[in-house]
Structure formats: C-alpha cells, structure tokens
C-alpha cells in the first residue's frame, strides 16, 4: 500500500483472502480508470483475464475512502465476471476485496499496484481460457517512461 498517501494508508489495508487459503486461478478484471500511464494502452471498460496467485491481498477500506479513490481515478481495475459485470460472488471477486477492487494507483497514477499477475501471460499460455489476456501494462509503461 505504499502507493497511497500516509493518510490513505491509515484508512485502507491489505488483508487475507476471505476464503482463508491460497488462490491460484484465472480472474477477470475490468479497467475502470486509465489515469495511470501503465494503462494507457488498455481499453477503458475492457475486460482482461490474468492469473491470480496469492493468499493475502484483499483490499479493505471504508466506504468513504473507497469513494475518494474512485473519485480521484485511483481505482484502476475491479474483479468482474467473464461478461464484465461486478459480482460479490467469490467465483469472480476471488479474494473478497471491498468494491471488487483489484488494482489501485498512486494519486499521480505513476505507481500501479494490482493483484492479478499480468507478467505471467504470454502467447501460448492459457490458450484454453476465454478472454483477452494482454492488458498491455508493460508496453504502456515502457512507452511512457522512456
């Protein structure tokens, strides 16, 4: 949570998954803000399927702080169904994150933190999984920071 301000860190935490064990599966996430340079090549509203593999990582915050993060464009991605719909069901929101939050950014967008492992996708990997897998984080970042 270092990408949040000191005050935001006091109000937001990363917690253990609600199921109490390690998760390893493909998850669907929707880009809800492309304020971050890391998401400039991702489609706003686009749904991407990437591996999740973690035991900790559920995003927890008060409704007030979640509202502030959304208002500032800091909520970058949310867990969704394969159809792009928000769902509290653990099939889709695999770790029980509040407001289905999967990825957040620093206030200026230059730091991105997310749970799904975009770096684990490649051509020929998970070819039997439905959905777009390349959120183009690294391509976006390289173009912005070069």
PLM feature spans:
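Amide-donor transfer/coupling interface in amidating biosynthetic enzymes
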Residues: 14-146
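Single conserved hydrophobic/aromatic residue that forms the stacking wall/gate
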Residues: 1-13
